[in-house]
Each structure stands twice: as structure tokens, then as C-alpha cells.
């Protein structure tokens, strides 16, 4: 921690030295509509080299100071308009610039409908604008993953599919929690999932209204140190801002319907009182169109107020207040195919608010300072109403105390008979809040431009839900105990970061950009076993523009490199495993002389196992890349390696316990019974002679009970090669060809020793099974690897004169090889399957003593010398589900084709149509593991044939 602070101070002092030697220049002007000349207030002007920017005031004026001399690139953006870049050669202050933005339209010469590599960024960064989203009819933010290099389309683009974003990962089933480590933020506010008790997964994006999105930025490479609590990159969503026309969207797909309406209101003359953006979106998806009753609904409302203050003083203050909400969820109450009055309701309510103040004093020692506060509250209550029946009354054990208990209507109650409905409610209310302060310095030195930002973040995560409970506690099912989420401590985190972006120009038109940053996170969990933990995250990137000239074959050549460490905080599921209870019946009398039955149970609670040695999961990321522009053809190639260390993994812990079991008497109706709560001994009292009492004989039963403990697993490695080739436009055909793809390799092999046993079998001596095996990993396969080669070829024809754009995309998988692994497997077990023997085992009597498990030959010999021990130990052998479980599987190449069409009709109407797998490819693919040919139809390899149409109105 001390070294980190010293490094931060050193970087800051170096930045101050640079600032004192600065010779800055000023650029000012106006941003107006190209057709009407009206000012475009709240447009943004961004200096691309430093990522410093400003917001246009109500008169359309902007001023950006402290810019370096020489060539600088400015990007001007405004929602609904095509962005524009200005390249200026600054030798003195430049004023009076008039930037004329044209409305985004297919009549423009340049239109993008795919993910574009961000310019002037050393790390891999892709940008997807509104035109691309409309052309591809995005209804869920996670759908944009298909637009990345090598990305694959999904057939059913509906809200029923709660797919989580997992950057640079083939699937969310891989080890290392790839989706949990992929961060999502909307207008700078993190959409977190740390407060969930039921999963350790990425945040769901179904509550985010897509019709209100202006653009999406996807950082798959090294993220800025400004962003913490991640390990696999970040997705940044930017929503609409500024004065906009009334827009109405309607989308129709087989499983999904969507309608939205939005507008940016000018409050007062020339927006002197600010601008209010409002958007409402209704969307509904059905699970099955032949029985459209199980559905997911999204009712999203967005209100956003923006205002420029203190414009006259030359140091504008931008005030933004955002409020986003969603009322929706999944519902199956109306399904006539289900049992009468049975249903499942899952709320997906969200309320997110944010206040941001951005002040730009443009001083020598301070360029910009931003203060932001945000809060996110969710309601994920789930109700499940089930139909139950029982011919006899069953005991429900609800005690939380260890020992023997009698069904007396308190700790153990007797359930009803006949038919009834039972309503179970799982109440989860995650809360995330944060306070953020960020400052920026921007200056120019004699031979180098320098941009420094530093900040502090405070975030907290918790859950105010009640957990699982029942509407009628007398009907609470067996083994239910109350476990409230709102009693668990909140997780608090303070992040400190500093980042220095240095840029050195060369005489040949090239330049070198180096970004170095350091982040320190301090995590505190009060009243828990974890206390306070700290983590240090250094990150750095380099971008070398070797030369820049349009007079040679190589118009530009850019080399990039990067490294970084990113730390992912744990979820509440990881931090707070629940207490488990083992309930075993120790006595059942049958009906006694009074017509009653006596039931006794022994309860053994296994307290929540907190791992005080738990380490925070982190990733080490490395990147190398090259970009080139050769005669109008733009080429980008990136090589990456991501290693996830200390991933969060759940493991089973087995604890021995014992109790006294008493068999019932044959003539039960002649006695009454009492049970000792401490010893479990049963006393029978004769009805004919109450003085005759006898303690019934009992036997001691030895059992194991299990509980979950979260630990750190083995390192997971992902590496690959990504490429994008945008060929020069074929002017005669108005067509551009794009080839993108990725060569991806994943390897995860769990080497951590984990326990496993069966709790349902018995030993040779008749006792419940008491042996525990210790294996590498918690499955039959300790790990797996997978290599894929995906390539997409997209032909985009854009005819501006008729406002038409057509894209045809071929998605091809040329290579798919995967294999499960386990170094200790024995093939040919029982002639067909594979068997895995544990490395060690323990017994009920000595749970802490690990005994080496016999080898296959020793186990065979044991069968002759001690058949009982052999039979007991053989139960620990884990067997594969198929004979080809560990066989390398090579899939033959396969492909699908998508068609997208967008047509503008006049100035106010546009229509988009798309069809995935429109050829409905049903060819066969070959699997080497099974040596079989299987149809691609509904195989999951390619999307099913699917289509949709969207109508947009701008008034």
C-alpha cells in the first residue's frame, strides 16, 4: 500500500512539472445543424488523444483549452447526427470554428453497421453506434456480442434468453467466472451483480431499454484504472442526450414485440433552463409462440435532465440528473397448460438514479473535475405457487438448534393431508451505491503532451431481501429455515487511482502514446470474518504510430501493446454461504393408545463456512496488436492472453455427526412415549400400569453432512488472435467487404483438492456411508480445453441516393476442437466407461486424516484380502457418463448466413428487416468423438431461422 501511494505521488509530481512547463493552445467555435444553422446545444467535443472533452452550451459554443501544439484530433458528437472529426494543426489559438453536423441518415456517404475499432486507443476498444443497433435490431444489450470479431448470432433474440455478457470467452460455462468478471456501466453508473445471493454471474441486461441507447463501447482489452471491480473488460452504454425529435419505434419478431417513444424537450428559449430527455419502452417476449403465456415483460422509463450553468464565467458547470426504472419480469400465471392455479412470477424491477456535476475551470493546475453519486435498487422477488398433496400428515422440521426434537407444533409441525397450494416467496433486493470524484489535468510540454487523471471511488453493495419464506409458515416445506439477506453486512470498497497519458509526436507524422495507471482497492466487510482486504492493480498500454502519410502504399502503421491487472470483488453468494441443516428421524412410534403418533428428529446444523483465507479473483491481461491502412484497406490484428488467478470456486465440506436411532415397538398402541431432548433416548410408559416405564434400546448412527465453502481455484488461461479487415470500398457497386474473426483457445484445469462422497448409500457394516474421497477438482473431468476458429464475411451495400443499406453476413466456424481432461482417469472401465479414482480418502472416525487411495492394481488385490473395505472404497470411484467422455472432439466446419436490410422512406420513416440463418441451413456436421453426423437444425451450433422487422418514426 505504501509503495502504491509513493508511486501515485511520483506520477502526480511529474505531471505537475510538465504542467508548469506547458504552452497550451485554445480552440473555440460553434456546433450547428448543417441544414438549419441552429445551435446543437449539449453536443460533445472530444480531444481524442487525451480523451478530454467539453459540452457545447445553449448557444452552440464550445471552448477547449490547454491543447498541445501540432496536429490534434477533435471528435464532435450529437445524438441523431453523424459524428465528425476535425484534424487541426495548432500553432496558435484557433477561434471561430463552425462545425456543421449532418443528421444521421442513409443518404450520407459513410454509414457504419458493425463494430468499429476505436481510433487513437492503445487497448482493444470497439464502438457500436445507433445506426448499427437499428440495422441489427438489438433488443438486449448482450446481443451486440455478435458484432465483435468472430462473434456469432443467436437465433431467438428475445428477452426470455437472459444471456450474460462474457468478454473474450467462448461461453459462460468456462471456468474462471468470465461473465462475472465482465463489467457493464450505463452513463458511467455500474450495473453490478455483487449483491446477489443466488448466483455468482454477470449482471443481467434485460432491464436496460435499448431504444434509449445512443452508442455502446466495448473494451475487451486493458481497461483504464478508472474502472475497478472487473477482470474481463467492460461494456459502456451511453444513452441519448440533448434536444431530439419525437421518435416512435415498433419492432415485431415471432417471440418479441417492442414499442418505444422518446423525445428531448427544450426547457425554455435556447435551452436556458436545460433539456429533459424522456423515453418509455414496452417490450414483451414469449417462451413459446404456440402457447404464448410464459413471458418476460420490460416497461422501461428514462428521465434525464441536463443543464449548463455558469456559462458566462467561462468555466461551465454541467449538471446531469438521471432516473431510470423498469417494472417487469417473468410471468407464467396465465398458462392454461400448467396445473390449475400454479404459477411462477419473477419480478425484475429496477430503479437507478444518478447526479453528476462536471466543472471545467480550464486552469493550469486543473482542467476538469467531476463529482458523481449514484444508487441502484432492484427487486427480484420470485413467487412460486405449487400444488401439493399427501395421503398422511408429514413432519416439517424447522428448528435451528442442534439436538433431538419432537413434533409438538413448534420446532416440528405436522403438515396437512389431502390437496393444497403452497406459495414460496424468495425475496431479493440488491442495492448498489457509489460516490465518485475525478479530476483531470491536461497540458502540453516542449516535446510531449501529458494528460493526468486521478480519482477516488466509494461503493457499497448489499441486499435488503428476506430470502426464502412462505406465505403460510405452517405449510413451509421440510428442512426450510429462515435465512434473511438483510441481516448480512454490506460490502464497502474504496478505490484510489491515478493515470498518466503521455503522447510524443515525431517529425515523420507518427507519434508514441503511453498510458500508465495504478489502482488501489480497499475492501471492508464489517462484522465478518473477512475484515479489510487491499488489492493493487497496475495497468499500462502503448500505441506507436510509426508514420502517417497518404503518399505511400502504407498510409499508416500502428503498433500497440498492453498489460494490466484487474481485480474482481466477490459476490455475496461467495462471502456468505448459508447454514445447512441435516434432519434425521430418530423415532416414529406409530399410532399410540391415545390415537397419536410421536415423531422425533435429530437436527445437526452446519454453520456457514466463511473462508477467512479467501483471496480476491484477478486477471493478468496482455495484448499485442498491429493496425495498418494499405491503399484504403484497414487491417487490425490483436493477440491477447488473459490469465484468471484465484477464481471463486465452490467446494463441499463434509462434517461427521452421530445420533441415537430407536426402532418402534410392535405393540405401539399399548404405550405412550417421551423423548429425551439431550440423549435422544425414548421412554415407553405402559397404559395399563403407568409405573412400568422402560428405556427402549437404541443404536448409534454415524453420518456425514455437507456444506458449501467458497475457495480459490486454479488459474484459467484464455488466449487468442482477433482480426478485422475492412477492404476499400468498391465504388462501382457501392459495396464494402469486411472480414473479421478470431482464433480462440481456452484451457482450464482445476488442481485444487476437493472432497466428494455419496450420502445415500451404506457401508458394508450397515452404517450410512462415511468415506470421503479427495479429487483434483469437483467433477469427473478436472478441466477441459477448447480451440475455435471463427470467421465472418460481411458484404455491405449502401446506396445513398435511395437511402438503402443491405448487408449479407456469412458466419463460419472452420475449427472447433475440445476435450475434457483428467490425468488420473482410467479408460476402459467396465469395458466402456472411464473411471476416476480419488487421490486420498478419509473416514467418519478420522475426518482430518487423509489416507492415500489405492491404485487400480492395489484396489484389485484388496478385493481378495478385504472384500468389505474394497466394496466401501469402490463407491468413491467416479464414472464418466459416456464412453467418449474424455475423447477429443473435432467438429467439422459449419456456417450460417444472415440478411439485414434498412430503408429510409423520406425524412421521417425507416424500416429495417433481418433474417438470421435465412437459408435455414440443415446440413450435417461430423463429431469425431461420437463418429456421427448430426443435423445443424436445433443443434445450437448455428442460430435457428429467425426474422424481425422494425418501423421507426421521427417527427
What are these regions (language model features)?
Residues 643-646, 650, 654, 661, ...:
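C-terminal beta-signal and adjacent terminal beta-strands/loops
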Residues 97-99, 205-247:
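A beta-strand signature from Gram-negative outer-membrane beta-barrel systems
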Residues 506-508, 662-827:
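Gram-negative outer-membrane beta-barrel transporters
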Residues 65, 189-219:
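Short acidic/polar hinge/loop motifs at secondary-structure boundaries
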Residues 309-328, 344-528:
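Face-selective signature of the C-terminal outer-membrane beta-barrel domain
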Residues 145-190:
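Extracytoplasmic beta-strand/coil segments of soluble accessory domains associated
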Residues 249-284, 290-370, 374:
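Transmembrane beta-barrel wall of Gram-negative outer-membrane proteins
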Residues 30-36, 43-48, 75-81, 91-135, ...:
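Short, acidic, small-residue-rich periplasmic hinge/interaction motif at the N-terminus
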